Curated annotation (Swiss-Prot):
Localisation per UniProt entry: Cell inner membrane
Keyword Nuclease: no
Keyword Membrane: yes
Gene assigned in the entry: atpC
Source species of the chain: Dechloromonas aromatica (strain RCB)
Protein's UniProt name: ATP synthase epsilon chain
Membrane topology: Peripheral membrane protein
Alphabetically ordered keywords of this record: ATP synthesis, Cell inner membrane, Cell membrane, CF(1), Hydrogen ion transport, Ion transport, Membrane, Transport
Subunit structure, interactors included: F-type ATPases have 2 components, CF(1) - the catalytic core - and CF(0) - the membrane proton channel. CF(1) has five subunits: alpha(3), beta(3), gamma(1), delta(1), epsilon(1). CF(0) has three main subunits: a, b and c.
GO CC annotation: plasma membrane; proton-transporting ATP synthase complex
Gene Ontology MF terms: ATP binding; proton-transporting ATP synthase activity, rotational mechanism
Entry's transmembrane regions: none
C-alpha cells in the first residue's frame, strides 16, 4: 500500500475535501508545489489555480479550484485555508468567461476611479477557473 498523508481543503464557507492522499499538488507563488507524505514543515501562500489530489485507489486526481489562500504542511497533515474553494466539476464556465470579459474590459478602459489591482485579481481568478475547467475536461475525455 502506498504511503499517504491526511489533507484538508477548507474555504470560509465549507470543508471541500478531507481525506488521505498519496500526493497533493498546489499552485504556489513561485510555481507548483508537490507534497508527499512526511514532507518537511512548510507554510506558504498559494495563488489562484487548481489543486490536484491523488486519492488512494482512484486512477484520476481530484481537482479543486482555489482563489488563493494559505498552505500549511506538516509531516502527517496538509491543510489548505482557501479564500474560495470549488470542486472543479462544480465550476461554471459561462460565469468564468463573463468574469474574464468584465475584468479585461475594466483593464482596457482604465480611469482614475478603477481599482486596477482588483480588476487584475478578478482576471487572474477567472483565468484560473477556466484552466481548472479545461484540466477537468482533459481528465474526463
Amino acid at each position: 500500500m502506498a504511503m499517504t498523508v491526511h489533507c484538508d481543503v477548507v474555504s470560509a464557507e465549507e470543508s471541500i475535501f478531507s481525506g488521505l492522499v498519496e500526493i497533493a499538488v498546489f499552485p504556489g507563488e513561485a510555481g507548483e508545489l508537490g507534497i508527499l507524505p512526511r514532507h518537511t514543515p512548510l507554510l506558504t501562500r498559494i495563488k489562484p489555480g487548481t489543486i490536484r489530489l491523488k486519492v488512494p485507489d482512484q486512477s484520476e486526481f481530484e481537482l479543486v479550484y482555489v482563489s488563493g489562500g494559505m498552505l500549511e504542511v506538516q509531516p502527517d497533515m496538509i491543510t489548505v485555508l482557501a479564500d474560495t474553494a470549488i470542486r472543479a466539476h462544480d465550476l461554471d464556465e459561462a460565469k468564468a468567461l463573463e468574469a474574464k470579459k468584465r475584468a479585461e474590459e475594466a483593464l482596457a478602459n482604465r480611469n482614475a476611479e478603477m481599482d486596477y489591482a482588483a480588476a487584475e485579481a478578478e482576471l487572474a481568478q477567472a483565468v484560473a477557473q477556466l484552466q481548472a475547467i479545461q484540466r477537468l475536461r482533459k481528465h474526463t475525455h
